[in-house]
Amino acid sequence: MIAYKSADQLAKLIKDKEISSVELLDYYISRVEKYNSDINAIIVKDYEKAKKAALKADEELSKGNTLGPLHGVPMTIKDSYDLAGTVTSRGNPALKDNVASKDALSVERLKNAGAVIFGKTNVPYNLADFQSYNEIYGTTNNPWDLTRSPGGSSGGSAAALASGMTGFETGSDIGGSIRNPAHFCGVFGHKPTWGLLPPRGHAAPNVLAQSDLTVIGPLGRSAQDLETGVLAVSYTHLRAHET
């Protein structure tokens, strides 16, 4: 079933023209509209911009151009990453109107790698819990058992992946916030080495966690997806791309 294919597999399907990015985005959106009301993983929707990005990906491919390893792959991101024009709340009611003016650097790099970002996923208050409830968006449920938690703080990310509502995801981790929900939901998650991935655009306004604790990282449907995500966002990948 295409909903449960890895990001690398989805990118290959698009590259081989077995499915278009627009078709794949529409497919994931249809699954969000069908299943998200029960799971409550995706809490911010940015469909119109995503449709334009998917169309651009298809147009570039028709010219023989590939944008990157995630070319045309629809994905969502944790509600702690800035996505221009959308709210970054971090689950904190005080930030419910905090509209990002520009993308986080990691989001910018994911887009440069070809990803089509169509929404954001739920988190606990200030990303500080092993469940994913906040007063703004409510509780995210585990898609395997709606009476149970998907974990946290990247619970919305893991639940969206496990339910086949997105092709790839992002999270962040200090003491298990990627690894815990990945385990709870049966998907893959990786806490990268500190300093490998850029944290700019992943912090509360005027507040920074200790830089030697917080890292950002990928969640996916395969271990290969984790490598793809890390390389797409890392400084190493940027230097290689520029040379």
Predicted segments, located by residue:
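An N-terminal boundary/leader segment
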Residues: 1-52
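Short, well-ordered beta-strand elements within core beta-sheets of diverse protein domains
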Residues: 10-16, 95-99, 214-221
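Conserved hydrophobic/aromatic pocket- or pore-lining residues that grip, position, or stack substrates
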Residues: 28, 50, 72, 78, ...
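Long amphipathic alpha-helix in the N-terminal Rossmann-like dinucleotide-binding domain
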Residues: 50-58, 114-115
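Immediate post-signal peptide segment of exported/extracytoplasmic ligand-binding proteins
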Residues: 57-73
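Enzymes and membrane/adaptor proteins characterized by extended Gly/Ser/Thr/Asp/Glu-rich
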Residues: 69-106
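Short glycine/serine-rich loop segments
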Residues: 102-230
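Conserved small/polar residues in nucleotide/adenosyl-binding loops
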Residues: 236-243
